[in-house]
């Protein structure tokens, strides 16, 4: 009986990942593109998708600081993904990034890891956020090499 309930609990879908899936797929799809004809249109799509993420996550019961931290992670992930493409690095994306639009900040690589460290202090409460950040890392988020410094500091 106890084993069945733990299997059921572990098989539940992470609401943040479920809400972010369209955005994550879209960002992953542009990672290896050679050109982007309409960068402002793409930015508009991501702004709309982040707003939709918010609505979907709230409908699934997420809110407050956890939702804000998840949105922050997604903004930094998308911004870094775009800026690491040949066309994104030559664009004005950095000047009008998702992070600047949603959080009035221009650099979020290190804060992503501050949020991660804070979430790890209460993993049971923050599991959905931790898993979402893990997905961002697995899809290539590096915090512009901040991850190397962060990992080294954990190994010492």
Sequence positions of predicted segments:
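Membrane-proximal low-complexity regions enriched in glycine and acidic/polar residues
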Residues: 68, 73-148
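Cationic, amphipathic, low-complexity alpha-helical segments enriched
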Residues: 1, 147-150
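Juxtamembrane amphipathic/hinge helix adjacent to a transmembrane helix
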Residues: 151-156
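Non-catalytic, solvent-exposed interaction/assembly segments
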Residues: 1-80
